[in-house]
Regions:
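Alpha-helical scaffold segments
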Residues: 1-170
Length: 170
């Protein structure tokens, strides 16, 4: 199994243009790249089952970004939620199209306001917003009010009391 030639070309062009972050909409099979100029969109054309094809796409991204052809390294998945990722790799993690990599960035102690903006573009998730708001640099930056506003608007949809209290505390 391999990428279609069209997808391979488009993804390599996207990566050559040095995107700031990448996200994948798995339901519509679209890959988005964030750049200084805006957003690029690549409609994926699977040559096999969608889940297998997405794995191949992520392997290409990982091979280009980290030099790891097997996809997002398993050992990093264990470290991410503990904030044990190295700060110099945070920008690279946002190029993998992996939800767990975005969590790694959101949990990192070296998270900056700009990296928080990119991570938020990649995965607008209330848990990620709470993770990022634990970082003083994000709270003081431009993303702090945006994330806080999102959590306030999302409060009616929360069902867990602990999560509601945590959102209000932040």
């Amino acid at each position: 199994m391999e990428l279609s030639s069209e997808d391979n070309l488009r993804l390599n062009v996207l990566l050559r243009n040095q995107p700031l972050a990448i996200r994948i909409d798995e339901s519509s099979m679209v890959l988005y790249g964030l750049s200084e100029k805006g957003e690029a969109k690549v409609q994926l054309n699977p040559t096999c089952r969608d889940d297998q094809y997405l794995r191949i796409v992520r392997e290409l991204l990982s091979g280009h970004v980290l030099g790891s052809p097997g996809g997002y390294p398993v050992y990093l998945q264990r470290w991410t939620r503990m904030g044990q990722t190295r700060d110099e790799n945070l920008e690279q993690l946002l190029l993998l199209g992996e939800p767990e990599a975005v969590i790694a960035v959101a949990c990192a102690t070296g998270l900056t306001d700009e990296l928080a903006r990119r991570a938020w573009w990649t995965a607008q998730d209330p848990d990620n917003a709470r993770r990022m708001l634990r970082n003083p640099a994000v709270v003081k930056g431009a993303m702090g009010p945006e994330l806080a506003q999102f959590l306030i608007e999302y409060l009616p949809f929360e069902t867990e009391p602990e999560v509601i209290v945590e959102s209000l505390r932040l």
